[in-house]
């Protein structure tokens, strides 16, 4: 059964101040479960120095791409110094919004959902595979920005034709 808990994009402090601790805790718990699912999938699908193609699908049975990418972006950011993670994936991780979440002592709560039971190189391979598999899904859905730009371009072309027709009529 797929976890449908929404990702909570704020810190525990914010959640406490706004009476949203239940949502924060549920999301944090789901992040940890997703991290564990990723680690298990890598362990199950790594054979003969290869990460099997079913690896990402195993995690997708439990979580959607949003949660998987949130956990992986957090992991890559926490391991930014590690040379076994590609520059491309490090750059990608910076584009995913991950909330900074420090406790009263300054300790980062996000470390609880860092994929760390497997080699960072395997985590990098998993992330690359997940990004490749997700791309066709995203290409099927046009972005809102592209749709708006396309409509604006069509409207501009239509208004230019109207101006030309009015000028020709004069």
PLM segments and residue spans:
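Gram-negative host-targeted secretion-system effectors, predominantly Type III and Type IV
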Residues: 1-169
């Amino acid at each position: 059964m797929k976890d449908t808990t929404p990702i909570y994009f704020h810190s525990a402090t914010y959640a406490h101040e706004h009476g949203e601790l239940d949502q924060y805790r549920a999301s944090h718990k789901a992040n940890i479960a997703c991290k564990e699912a990723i680690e298990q999938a890598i362990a199950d699908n790594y054979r003969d120095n290869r990460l099997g193609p079913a690896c990402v699908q195993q995690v997708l049975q439990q979580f959607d791409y949003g949660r998987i990418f949130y956990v992986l972006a957090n992991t890559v950011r926490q391991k930014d110094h590690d040379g076994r993670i590609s520059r491309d994936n490090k750059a990608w991780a910076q584009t995913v919004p991950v909330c900074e979440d420090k406790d009263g002592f300054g300790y980062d709560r996000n470390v609880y959902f860092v994929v760390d039971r497997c080699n960072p190189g395997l985590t990098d391979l998993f992330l690359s595979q997940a990004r490749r598999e997700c791309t066709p899904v995203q290409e099927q859905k046009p972005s809102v920005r592209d749709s708006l730009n396309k409509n604006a371009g069509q409207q501009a072309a239509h208004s230019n034709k109207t101006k030309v027709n009015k000028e020709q009529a004069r």
